[in-house]
Structures are given as structure tokens and as C-alpha cells.
């Protein structure tokens, strides 16, 4: 399994609960389409972190392999290119609902289970 990690802060006129709900709805859509296997949305507890400037939110998206991750990325990219049918329009709305509030300090990393099976 591959695990795509995202660390971010949120900004703008949205509550933490609204933002997390919007992100969850987007990721749930990708899971329902079998574009991802699972996901987690976590938040730093009590500000406890030893890495200076580590963003508050941590999102983990699990995929079977790089191919599935690429399919998920392409799904979102297609939505952003405005080649939309009705279902894609809903994905775009869900993506925009959380993504517009992600601060510029976003960080990404891709990890895998070790050792490879």
C-alpha cells in the first residue's frame, strides 16, 4: 500500500468542522469511485509537535499502488480542466469547498509499506 500524506493549515472564512466535513465528503467520493482505498483526517492535539512549523492538519490517503494514486490525481485534474459531466461537477464542488481554504504552507509526502510485499 502507498500512503499519500498531506499536512496543511486552513485559512479563510470557514470553521474547522465545516472544512473537515467538506474534505471528508470529497475523499468519500473518491473512495466510492474506488480511486482510493481509505483515508484519515487528523489534527494536531494540544499543539503538540516537535517539528517546527508543522501544519495543524494531517490527511492520509491510502492507495493500492502508484497506478491507483495516479488515477485519483487524474480524476481531480480532469475536474479542474472543466471537462465535466454531472458527477464530475459534484466532485469539483466538493474539491473546491475545502481546497480554497488550504493555506500556502501545505506539505506533501508519499510513503509505502515496508518491506515491499
Question: Locations of the language-model features?
Answer:
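Short, flexible turn/loop "capping" segments at secondary-structure junctions
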Residues: 1-2, 50-53
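Active-site-flanking beta-strand signature of metal-NTP-handling nucleotidyl enzymes
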Residues: 2-9
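Hydrophobic pocket/interface hotspot
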Residues: 6, 19, 23, 59, ...
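Structural beta->alpha junctions
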Residues: 10-13, 63-65
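Short amphipathic alpha-helical segments
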Residues: 14-41
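A broad, structure-centric signal for solvent-exposed, well-ordered loop/edge residues
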Residues: 17, 48-49, 70
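An amphipathic, aromatic/His-enriched active-site/gating alpha helix that lines ligand/cofactor pockets
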Residues: 29-38, 52-54, 60-109, 116-117
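Short, solvent-exposed loop/turn elements at beta->coil junctions and helix N-caps
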Residues: 42-48
